[in-house]
Amino acid sequence: MTNLSDLLPRDPSPDALLDVFTEWVESSGISLYPHQEESLLAVLAGDNVIVTTPTGSGKSLIALGAHFAALAEGRRTWYTAPIKALVNEKFFALCEAFGAERVGMVTGDASVNADAPIVCCTAEILANLALREGRGADAGQVVMDEFHFLAEPERGWAWQVPLVELPQAQFVIMSATLGDVTALADDLTRRTGRETAVIGG
């Protein structure tokens, strides 16, 4: 499959980016579901997005499209997950999609290409960066997977801190089990100044 980095349009308009990404997806025999296209349109409009669709509904493709948009717009984008195994899995998937030179990984155990424009990391890594650098952090976009970990008594802070300390970022929040996200969406909009689209909730 063609590397997405090779398809970055000269004009990174929302329409151009959606067309290129859709064609790339369809070249592998996949069609976007309506909720995936709706999510990507919101990302391309500059909105935060909260995706609460069931497991197996293609949230990974939404994340991929979000990273593509950020890369095209010259924004550094972060993918966070709760466990190192999932971070590793996503790192290799994104390397395949964008090329290894564009993707980095940082966990408590390893650091690979940490200055890359797309970085996969555990939630705690990004939270600590947010605490250290805040508004000065190079974080134009944050994709947070398995966001229901926010409710974990011992680890939930790592999902909360970026929302508070990185108001410059566009957030793409994903989980199959979030429940009512009205308050979260309102809070995100207030903190970031971006509209927040809720998909599937």
Annotate each predicted stretch with a short phrase:
Residues 10, 18-25, 29-201:
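Conserved P-loop/Walker A NTP-binding site and adjacent catalytic elements of P-loop NTPases
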